[in-house]
């Protein structure tokens, strides 16, 4: 019987991200997928700033950006008339080293991640489906459709909305399906490609166009007209007049066209014993805001370092409980918020139509205000995700609480995020480090990085001469305005953190 520390089921963006992080943590794994290779079609296509920050920790961000397209401007139109526009390229200036959303087609994205895995000597086992599994004796015993059996310390179900992992665990997947049908098409438009997002509001709901590939391909997304909703033979030619009406230019070439329904569901649990759910296996939601794939990658990062720390004896196994307690509430909140936003965009009732016609245009005008722009960026980029109520979160200093994402500070070479590339617990001090703190950190085998105090650190909400213990995922675990070394030692003891 084959044995592995971690069995990853599913080689989409979530499973691939989990595999890459485990590889960088030097944790062995197997990754299997029922399909014959990476996906050939692209649904998700927006990579948010937080995902790029997480990619930077493993040296991938620059390559992803080079292959993707930075959105320059977002235009909001109603009835063919522009009612608002928003500069996207520097929307989050000062908040992140990546102050923009990036368009990067999911199929290209998956091939890129798979290639990086291969370069690390890690093979994806295609045409290998999970058939069944059970847990006994502190192990996962999995049966694969190939007839092979596999024993694992842990199993991560990253196998999508039709997750076999979730099915075997018997977990509920409550939620629903929106009534409308939607179309998606990758096309070549007449004229030069613009790196802009265009949202067209009207009685037909919302229709979007945005760049998807560097070869000049544009992604079109919208609602199928009501009179065509029940057709199962719908082709792009059938909706072409509808599309032409809202984009205002001719479609010269259609590379891909599909229709689909949108669902919103969250699994009742993200962990049962030694098995975990991540990505679409645990939550699916509307495409509003481009959150789905990024949330799955966030799941993978959260789970990866906890598995690595446990398997390598750095922390106790109880830390794995915090995967569900940190990620499940966020998934529920995200599904609820995207459901409200999506319903407002697509509903055909009088209230929704009035909102699109009157309220949204006026709200869009507020994006000229810097505070509104910053709030908008923090929300869509996932920088606002925090774990303040987690068992792993303690203390605060300045505006930064335990559980918050470490604020980015543009200081030195690469900013304060450069030290996060070690994927290890790490102490930051902004100002002067006390000897007692350094001694306590050394006893726990924690590196300490001291940054010169700066206006940029103050603007980010960091307290002068404060100490912050940063988790391997870039979130703050512990903070102390007084560099309380005894408090750091007590925190480490409480969560089971010990010297490697």
Predicted regions and their residues:
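FAD/FMN-dependent oxidoreductases across multiple families
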Residues: 67, 233-291, 295, 315, ...
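Core beta-strand elements of the Rossmann-like FAD/NAD(P) dinucleotide-binding domain
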Residues: 4, 145-154
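Helical substrate-recognition/capping region of FAD-dependent monooxygenase/halogenase enzymes
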Residues: 2-5, 9, 24-25, 34, ...
